[in-house]
Regions:
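Short, basic-rich loop-to-helix N-cap that marks the start of a DNA-contacting helix
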Residues: 43-54
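Short alpha-helical DNA-recognition segment
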Residues: 20-38
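Short, charged recognition helix plus adjacent turn
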Residues: 38, 67-80
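The alpha-helix within a helix-turn-helix
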Residues: 15, 26, 56
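A short, Lys/Arg-rich alpha-helix, primarily the initiator
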Residues: 1-21
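Intrinsically disordered, low-complexity basic tails/linkers immediately adjacent to helix-turn-helix/homeobox/MYB/SANT
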Residues: 57-66
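Residue-level detection of the helix-turn-helix DNA-binding "recognition helix"
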Residues: 16, 30, 41, 71
Length: 80
């Protein structure tokens, strides 16, 4: 798994936990829905920390809470 997939999985997980639709979290956080969908489909080469922070604000969690999962802990180095 790479970082883009881990970010997408985390967004989906948080939406399911909170019963929030993708469009709803986009609207709540002020991130354009197409940007969120690009992040979820791993089309975005760099999801961007600013957009992730906005989504965290919408979920009412910190960046630390967003990244504090076993998926992120298990990521391998992506520099080649």
């Amino acid at each position: 798994m790479n970082t883009k997939q881990a970010v997408a999985n985390r967004i989906i997980e948080l939406c399911k936990e909170r019963g929030i639709a993708i469009n709803a979290i986009a609207n709540i956080s002020g991130v354009p829905p197409m940007t969120v969908y690009s992040m979820l489909n791993a089309k975005s080469q760099n999801p961007g920390i600013v957009n992730i922070k906005k989504l965290c604000d919408g979920f009412e969690i910190t960046l630390g809470e967003f990244f504090s999962t076993s998926e992120f802990d298990a990521l391998e180095q992506e520099i080649e």
